[in-house]
A protein has these predicted regions:
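Active-site region of the double-stranded beta-helix
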Residues: 1-89, 99-236
Length: 236
């Protein structure tokens, strides 16, 4: 496990991280990840503070396949098949492997599994930046290159077209104990990433005690589970 901050001027392409069964074919592991947008790191929203997730419920696999076939013919219009969400500071999203996502331009704290598998399914970005075709086939087994059905199979279809995607994937901070109880002790500790079965993150009480609590200065603590809780890395 590891965590990072990414802070892009504009949005990233609608892309995907492979699930275990597809990643294993190229000797890798699947990559779950989560996002959190800390207010203290975002004095500027960048060019596009919206993120696209998944696909519209009425989109068919054939439509996605056709868009992927048009990757080298200009804008393949994949984003027209997806929903965008305005990003809200001090909230986050769960992004399971197999879910298409085009991250927006807020500075983002990202706890994730230590894997680098991905493929870019969108050909032309905001600002007319283009994506090269080799990234469409990134981490595809050699024998599957050119097989657009394989690219569609990489998509976790049920999760992408989930009509309750926001309900299942959006994460608002959750106090670990009653707020009144923690305020009496001079700090507030919150879970900020908690819907992934592999990795989670919270604001740590010991650092809040040491530095003094300030709701605008969350410090981020990464854990790995199941099993015993284990601290992996601190970002501040």
């Amino acid at each position: 496990m590891f965590s990072k901050f990414f802070d892009n001027l504009g949005p990233l392409p609608h892309h995907i991280h492979h699930r275990d069964q597809h990643a294993a074919r190229v000797g890798e592991s699947g990559k779950p990840e989560m996002y959190f947008f800390p207010a203290q790191q975002n004095n500027h929203n960048g060019e596009f503070a919206y993120t696209f997730f998944g696909l519209n419920e009425d989109v068919s696999k054939e439509e996605v396949k056709e868009a992927l076939k048009n990757f080298t013919k200009g804008d393949n219009e994949l984003l027209s098949m997806a929903k965008s969400y305005k990003l809200t500071l001090d909230t986050g999203w769960d992004v399971p492997p197999g879910v298409l996502h085009a991250p927006g331009s807020l500075c983002t704290y990202e706890p994730q599994f230590a894997s680098d598998v991905y493929a870019m399914y969108q050909s032309v970005l905001f600002g007319h930046h283009t994506v090269t075709e080799d990234l469409l086939w990134k981490n595809t087994p050699k024998e599957e290159i050119g097989n657009f059905d394989y690219l569609v199979d990489v998509i976790d279809w049920e999760k992408n077209v989930d009509p309750e995607f926001h309900k299942h994937r959006f994460m608002a901070p959750k106090p670990v104990r009653p707020i009144e109880e923690m305020e009496k002790e001079g700090f507030i500790e919150e879970w900020i990433c908690y819907k992934c079965p592999t990795v989670c993150a919270k604001t740590p009480d010991d650092f809040a005690r040491s530095y003094g609590y300030d709701s605008r200065q969350r410090r981020l603590w990464l854990y790995h589970y199941p099993g015993a809780w284990k601290m992996q890395r601190l970002e501040h």
